[in-house]
Amino acid sequence: DFVEKSGERWYYLKMDVEKFFYRMDHEVLMSIIRKKIGDKEAVRFLEHYVCHASRAFGLPLGVKSPLEISDKEMLWDVGIAIGGGLSHMYGNMYLNPMDQMAKRKEGIQYYIRYMDDVIILSTDKELLHRYKNMFSDFLGDVLKLRLNNKTAIRPVSHGMEFVGYTIRPFDVRLRKSTSLRMKRHLKTIQELYRDYEIDLDRARSTLMSYKALMDHCDCRALEKKIFEDFVLTHNPKEADTENG
């Protein structure tokens, strides 16, 4: 709201780290962990998870997906397993030095980060260009990462894509890709319930989690359509088999 009410032309810098989880450097990560955690047993446990995994998770620079290369070409000294609570914890710890530089050294007021997605707001477009170059150098020199081609500076009025939403001064909507992914997942949930592979509580909790996602944006028509289409039925043949 403050952007809309200010009457000024606002811009945003959207920074996205290239293949973040696949490119996290093990030495850099463990150095950060050792500075933050004093318990040696805990550090050894975390180091085992990071440095002694049963398989390699690192991608060479320029490779977009693990599907593009063989297991032998995956890198052992970078990358961590995605999923579970530890990967998100590692991700936040890894980029904390960047947060500290932004807030404490540079004093950037409108700095927002969720994992490797970063938004900075300003009325000064040239300042955002300076920030872009500064963070690009910091990521490369200190964290051994680089920004991808989604990194851009645009007017806020054009809409910012962030954490599954398109955010404008006057409204917030689900990104089209988020909406399509949600519809596909809910269709899968219906199929799993129909075939007795999940129970009612699981199906209902999935639907309600998406309702919470939609509650934060302007998509009442979409929400109404989702609830109308989400009908749970059991496969009659499966029911007959169970009764027999």
Give the label of every model feature segment.
Residues I37, S136-K144:
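A common structural junction motif
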Residues R104-Y110, L143-L147, R220:
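Surface-exposed helix-capping loop/turn segments at secondary-structure junctions
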